From Swiss-Prot:
Pfam families: ACOX, ACOX_C_alpha1, Acyl-CoA_dh_M. InterPro entries: ACOX_C_alpha1, Acyl-CoA_Oxase/DH_mid-dom, Acyl-CoA_Oxase/DH_mid-dom_sf, Acyl-CoA_oxidase, Acyl-CoA_oxidase_C, AcylCo_DH-like_C, AcylCoA_DH/oxidase_NM_dom_sf. One of its GO terms (biological process) is fatty acid beta-oxidation using acyl-CoA oxidase. Its EC number is 1.3.3.-. Belongs to the acyl-CoA oxidase family. This is Acyl-coenzyme A oxidase-like protein. Its cofactor is FAD. FAD binds at T350, G351, G352, M353, G354, Y355.
Length: 547
């Protein structure tokens, strides 16, 4: 399986379309991010292992070179990568540190006399784990603590040779095959251990931090934490690529399940032909909301891709686009979780046929389950969103205290009016305006609630921020998902309005309403608790979802 995947990667990257996409990546031409994301989605639909392995080599390893290196690094390393003269891997995660990448323990100690970095794995917890392409790759983009004169400058990325052109490991490098996994059997994941491996000083990807020949460290960002944030922000496109791959799996699973549901017949009126199983209400209720969600995620992900394109094309540093980073983090979590739920329903809705590997749904389930934790654990991704929303809320008070207070008062009064008995007949539950107002209301209330909780714990109870934040994580997750839901529904509605074909627009509007109804229906207890819905309105929403 692995050898076949290697052949497929080589074949795919030789295709003119993908060669052109690689050139666009190198040159950062307009809309290159969006094009690459869609290509990755389609490639993953054809074979998930091939799509993921291409992503490891070109998005992660290649992305590290493009986004963390200098123009000289791009010329030296990325162009030969495009020409398939070698392959690479991305080595950040360690046995002891995954989500908290700042705590990685691999060391890169600068040797002044030799003008080299010494890459070393000082302990078992510092072993690089789950590294894709570990058993085939020639070079690794290794994140390690940069140490000069015994002092760490924080994590930096280094290009480390792993194998020669014949596939033999270089001295000091150990690669251990992690063997069998739940899925992605075509991807070779392994453990990397470095025993004082020496690399040239120039192999440091130095966009955000460099070491001069005299051993002096220079960086445009003085704060270590801010510097590492900038490095992680530069890798944002690869996180969005996972969302696109998850959507590809959703779309493929739904296509198979819905087509099967239109061909399979079970039960029916006496003396008449059995009906298609899609005509059974439970089958429709399980599949159609997932289809609506897949459409919604398609439009909002394209929106995020367009924003990324614009920033990259204009040469902006992604670290300064915090709201975009938060959006991508939220979409990564939301899309991968929805994919898992969707494929499980697709499997069940196709019965025994869905369990057969030849029909692909069970394979997609196994292959994409890991999406919930790689490229950022989904729960941690929600914290990225929550921190940005908290920062946005506090910023408006710091910059314009009076305006912030007035805005908060106006929103609070407006929310109270919306939850009064006078408000319930203003909008009908089957109207898109009602659904948009509902998801905005939920996000706004949860945001105010989180701010109040954090303020009380830090200012009144004198707790440190970490413990205050940690005790509010459930609220953070709820707010972050509410924010992602709101943006997704808004982008879906905008896409529907801009659809040029009337017939397509009418059909898309039905799915947009279904998606919005799903969002409100699944949180109906919260809306009832906050008196945004009456029991009668909740019943109408339930009936609407069943139509």
């Amino acid at each position: 399986m692995r050898a076949l995947t290697v052949q497929r990667v080589k074949f795919a990257m030789d295709l003119p379309l993908l060669k052109r996409a690689g050139q666009d990546l190198a040159e950062k031409t307009k809309n290159f991010v969006s094009r690459s994301l869609v290509i990755g989605e389609v490639l993953s639909m054809a074979d998930m292992a091939t799509g993921v392995k291409c992503g490891i080599i070109y998005w992660l390893f290649g992305g590290a070179i493009r986004n963390l290196g200098s123009p000289e690094h791009v010329t030296k390393w990325f162009q030969p990568l495009q020409e398939q003269k070698y392959t690479g891997m991305f080595a950040m995660t360690e046995r002891g540190h995954g989500s908290n990448a700042r705590g990685i323990q691999t060391e890169a100690t600068f040797d002044l006399s030799a003008q080299e970095f010494v890459i070393d794995t000082p302990c078992e917890n510092a072993e690089k784990m789950y590294i894709g392409n570990a058993m085939y790759g020639n070079y690794a983009a290794v994140f390690a603590q940069l140490i000069i004169d015994g002092r760490s400058q924080g994590p930096h990325c280094f290009i480390v040779p792993v194998r020669d052109e014949n596939g033999s490991l270089y001295p000091g490098v150990t690669a251990i095959d992690m063997m069998y996994k739940e899925g992605l059997h075509g991807v070779d994941n392994g453990i990397l251990i470095f025993d004082k491996v020496r690399i040239p000083r120039e192999n440091l990807l130095d966009k955000f931090g460099s070491v001069a020949p005299d051993g002096q460290y220079h960086s445009p960002i003085r704060n270590k934490s801010a510097r590492f944030n900038a490095m992680l922000a530069a890798l944002t496109p690869s996180r969005l690529a996972v969302a696109f791959q998850a959507m590809g799996a959703m779309k493929l699973g739904l296509t198979i399940a819905i087509r099967y549901s239109h061909s399979r017949r079970q039960f029916g009126p006496k003396t008449k032909e059995e009906v298609k199983i899609i005509e059974h209400q439970t089958q429709t209720l399980r599949l159609m909301p997932h289809l609506a969600t897949a459409l919604a995620l398609t439009f909002v992900s394209r929106y995020a891709g367009a924003l990324l394109d614009e920033d990259v094309f204009q040469g902006k540093e992604l670290v300064n686009s915090r709201s975009l980073q938060a959006l991508v983090a939220g979409l990564k979590a939301y899309s991968t979780w929805e994919n898992i739920r969707c494929l499980q329903d697709c499997r069940e809705c196709t019965g025994g046929m869905g369990y057969m590997m030849e029909n692909r749904i069970s394979g997609l389930k196994c292959d994409t389950d890991v999406f919930a934790t790689f490229e950022g654990d989904d729960v941690v991704m929600l914290q990225v969103v929550g921190r940005e929303l908290l920062a946005q809320y506090t910023k408006q008070y710091e910059e314009k205290p009076l305006f912030g207070l007035l805005q908060n008062w106006a929103e609070s009064v407006g929310d109270k009016l919306r939850t009064s008995f006078l408000a319930f007949n203003m909008d009908t539950v089957d109207d898109l305006a009602f659904l948009l107002k509902a998801v905005k209301f939920r996000e706004r209330v949860l945001q105010r609630g989180l701010v109040a909780r954090i303020y009380y714990k830090v200012k009144t109870k004198k707790e440190d921020f970490f413990h205050a934040w940690n005790s509010c994580l459930h609220h953070v997750a709820s707010l972050s998902l509410a924010h992602t839901h709101r943006v997704t529904l808004e982008q879906f509605s905008l896409a529907v309005k801009s659809c040029p074909d009337q017939e397509d627009q009418t059909l898309l509007m039905k799915f947009c309403l279904l998606y919005g109804t799903k969002l409100v229906f699944q949180e109906r207890a919260w809306y009832l608790e906050h008196k945004y819905l009456t029991p009668m309105a909740s019943t109408r929403i339930r009936n609407q979802e069943r139509c």
